[in-house]
Design a protein with these regions (language model features):
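A glycine-rich beta-to-alpha transition motif near the start of alpha/beta enzyme domains, typified by
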Residues: 1-112, 170-285
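Hydrophobic alpha-helical segments and helix pairs
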Residues: 90-142
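Anionic-ligand binding region
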Residues: 132, 137-161, 172-194, 198
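N-terminal, positively charged, Ser/Thr/Ala/Gly-biased leader segments
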Residues: 1-22, 118, 136-163
Length: 285
């Protein structure tokens, strides 16, 4: 199997071009190639193929083989791959994802894509669509918004704000994100009974009205160095809690992303880098 390893702010995936390759069991392949000791090493597998609705279709598989609806860092790398590998010469493209069609603008330097701006669409705040439920398993009302909501995890009380960007996110504000015990608390949020489909969790430190630091515990992949949808969800949570303005620079372990919310259209835009690491071939056992 031919592959290309790429990353967006350190959020790394193995990319497979389905115009050239065939994968019978991508979930199993994702588990195999993601292993950082016995495989290639990545946060998961992303396939790039044809779409009858958009220019391209991407599918995302986590390191545990589960399929994700959307990946903001991953879709930027898809844009870089299809342009740099001559699958398109357009600098504005559409990509079909499990969370709908996304529209991307490619910024090209010396015939290579360096940055990508993604229209991530509208944030989803309806609890049943995220999904998130009450601690007793009952549903919130459709008009309710899970903002600064109490939650118990690890014998502690927290406050979270829940947003979906096509996949579920719980955002928690902390005083010191660098020293935060993510490995301890991340799994407790991911598998909490309030999240019927599990959740991604962002722990966020506010630096100013237009700057924040974030670490993320991804559903199915543990801590990753960046999460594009999570960064968008984080900025929406910041705005909903009146902690920042509508355009925020977010510092992640693997780099920086700029997120902008446009109230007039209710759309979130993400701008950030995409990097190709190497290409190769691997025998799938």
């Amino acid at each position: 199997m031919k592959f290309t390893k790429m990353h967006g702010c350190g959020n790394d995936y193995v990319y497979v071009n389905l115009f050239e390759e065939k994968l019978d069991d991508p979930a199993r392949v994702s588990i195999y190639v993601s292993d950082r000791h016995f495989g290639i090493g990545s946060d998961g597998l992303i396939t790039i193929g044809p779409s009858d609705k958009a220019d391209f279709r991407m599918r995302i598989y986590n390191a545990d083989g589960s399929e994700a609806e959307m990946c903001g860092n991953g879709i930027r790398c898809v844009a870089k791959y299809v342009y740099d590998h001559k699958l398109t010469d357009k600098t504005e493209i559409s990509v079909e994802t499990g969370a709908g069609i996304k529209y991307l603008t490619l910024y090209v330097e010396e015939n290579k894509v360096s940055q990508v701006r993604v229209d991530m669409g509208e944030p989803i705040l309806t609890p049943g669509d995220i999904p998130v439920v009450k601690t007793d398993g009952s549903a919130y009302g459709d008009d309710y918004r899970v903002i600064d909501e109490p939650i118990s995890a690890g014998n502690r009380e927290w406050h979270m704000t829940c947003v979906s960007m096509g996949n579920p996110h719980a955002v928690v504000f902390v005083d010191d994100v660098a020293g935060f015990e993510l490995e301890k608390y991340g799994p407790l949020f991911e598998n909490h009974k309030m999240f019927p489909k599990r959740t991604n969790t962002e722990f966020v430190e506010i630096l100013s009205r237009n700057e924040a630091k974030m670490r993320v515990w991804e559903r199915g992949s543990a801590e990753t160095w960046a999460c594009g949808t999570g960064t968008c969800a984080t900025v929406m949570a910041c705005i909903l809690n009146k902690k920042t303005d509508n355009k925020v620079l977010v510092h992640l372990r693997g780099g920086d992303l700029t997120i902008e919310y446009i109230p007039e259209t209710n759309h979130v835009f993400m701008t950030g880098p995409a990097t190709e690491v190497f290409s190769g071939e691997i025998d799938i056992m």
